[in-house]
Swiss-Prot record:
This is Transcriptional activator protein rep2. A zinc finger (unnamed) spans 177-197. Transcriptional activator which interacts with the mcb binding subunit complex formed by res2 and cdc10. Rep2 is required for the mitotic cell cycle start. GO terms for molecular function: SAGA complex binding; transcription coactivator activity; zinc ion binding. It comes from the Eukaryota. GO terms for cellular component: MBF transcription complex; nucleus. Keywords: Activator, Cell cycle, Cell division, Metal-binding, Mitosis, Phosphoprotein, Transcription, Transcription regulation, Zinc, Zinc-finger. It comes from Schizosaccharomyces pombe (strain 972 / ATCC 24843). One of its GO terms (biological process) is negative regulation of transcription by RNA polymerase II.
Length: 219
């Protein structure tokens, strides 16, 4: 059977072709638009204006584009080497362009300023959230220690305050009379006592007894 006799509606299922555009890089890029991708204008324009899209077909047969009707037809045996070389050249060119487009798309995704800014903001927000949650967890784990420390600090403060109050409310020393050494708790009582005590004339009981004895002896 000749290649030209095989109908085009049945793709070759024995040995399916492996083309460069079935690489993983194209699976990660969903139909990139040429206007949004940073690439050289010459490659984009030449690739976009190419009329030979036979290499994008799923058939194993080498085909050529029928420009009159826009439908692919099988190549004749005489034109088969020329079509194969053209398809091979188109495949190479397509793989290079698609690789360039994919790399450009990836580079743009990584170097897009708004995305970088949002990524940094998200990282900063996540860091703040994690730090707050970590502090909250530490506070919950060590809440008893914190309460004990606060209570001890308050107790020390109350002791210092009580000491100052006790010093301020310390009672006055006892007041002592300079003549008879009598103690008093108030200065007014001491003054009244000294007014009478200092004006008294000193006397001895022996004087009274001696006078009585002399009077009795004389009479």
């Amino acid at each position: 059977m000749h290649f030209a006799d095989i109908p085009l509606s049945k793709p070759c299922l024995n040995n399916p072709p492996t083309y460069p555009w079935s690489s993983p890089i194209l699976s990660s890029i969903a139909n990139p638009s040429l206007c949004d991708i940073v690439s050289s204008p010459s490659s984009v324009s030449s690739f976009a204006s190419s009329d030979d899209f036979a290499f994008m077909n799923a058939y194993c047969l080498p085909i050529q584009q029928n420009h009159q009707f826009g439908s692919p037809v099988a190549a004749s045996p005489n034109q088969q080497p020329l079509v194969e070389s053209q398809n091979r050249r188109n495949v190479t060119y397509a793989s290079l362009v698609i690789g360039k487009l994919g790399i450009a798309q990836l580079i743009r995704q990584q170097t897009d300023p708004p995305q970088i800014i949002h990524r940094k903001q998200d990282k900063g927000l996540m860091a703040r959230v994690l730090s707050r949650s970590k502090k909250q967890e530490e506070r919950e784990n060590h809440s008893s220690d914190a309460r004990d420390a606060i209570k001890s600090a308050l107790r020390r403060r109350m002791r210092r305050r009580e000491g100052r109050v006790q010093k301020a409310l310390r009672p006055t020393p006892n007041l002592i009379c300079s003549k008879c050494n009598t103690t008093f708790n108030h200065s007014t009582a001491l003054m009244m006592h000294e007014a009478t005590c200092l004006n008294q004339v000193p006397f001895k009981l022996s004087d009274f007894f001696v006078e009585d004895v002399i009077d009795d002896w004389l009479f």
